């Protein structure tokens, strides 16, 4: 099996909603393959939310005006197309705008329901004079890409319901370029640089993650034809390689205290890999192996970036009683009290 060096992905934040992502090194030719696929997916397939229809009080169609409002209905609709909104609901939801003049109507005047957020509250919608009054009902739905107003027109809709063009995509712009990069003596590897700009409703980082997930799901269809088919296998990352190497370490290298070491050896645990496959409950079942021994093991594994099978990822060694994280030492290194009748010395009480 051919093993390729694992590429790395780094992000350079350009602005609040714009980032440059660099993926390297890629096998020759894969820069364009990956770049084009990600770009097309980012522009067309990232889920978002948009207004699909509106209803303005006193208005029957879009080719008219509202008394006391500077903009006509067509202008109001054009303004509403620029609304940036996100919704957690899969079903259509309704928002309302009710404003009495004089003054301007902005997206900040919209009252959204729970689970819906308006991300550009300063966006201008309309201008009212002294006698102006504007009441708008907006329907928001989730979708992908662009849907014209004709497709948003529901059969049997009430009179006055005006369908709107929906721009669901939260991604504004995506560009990419491919450069040559060097790996050891070879200079024909690819470096892919993606420039992603989004609306306020999603970060560039999350948009790229969404595109990657979509492509993995689709390419998985081809892989399922034969999961044993030969291909290029991506090698482990440096962190993963370190973990793999750590699994083969003998537990002697953990520098455990006498009791903990002998208990584990008696139980048949000889390597770090065998140790991390155990849960805290498994270790507590070992004779003479108490909670303080478990704390010691967890601290030693944490130093290697590892943990027991059921240990939380948020484990903090400094929270362990008696352990000084700054020096890596125990305040009572020769003594444990594991509810076995008091504090006793390891070597003297070890039972084999």
Curated annotation (Swiss-Prot):
Region (Alpha N-terminal domain (alpha-NTD)): 1-226
UniProt xrefs under SUPFAM superfamilies: C-terminal domain of RNA polymerase alpha subunit (SSF47789), Insert subdomain of RNA polymerase alpha subunit (SSF56553), RBP11-like subunits of RNA polymerase (SSF55257)
Top-level taxonomic group: Bacteria
Annotated region (Alpha C-terminal domain (alpha-CTD)), positions in chain: 243-352
Region Disordered: start-end pairs: 324-352
Subunit structure: Homodimer. The RNAP catalytic core consists of 2 alpha, 1 beta, 1 beta' and 1 omega subunit. When a sigma factor is associated with the core the holoenzyme is formed, which can initiate transcription.
Similarity section: Belongs to the RNA polymerase alpha chain family.
Protein name: DNA-directed RNA polymerase subunit alpha
Origin organism lineage: Bacteria, Bacillati, Actinomycetota, Actinomycetes, Mycobacteriales
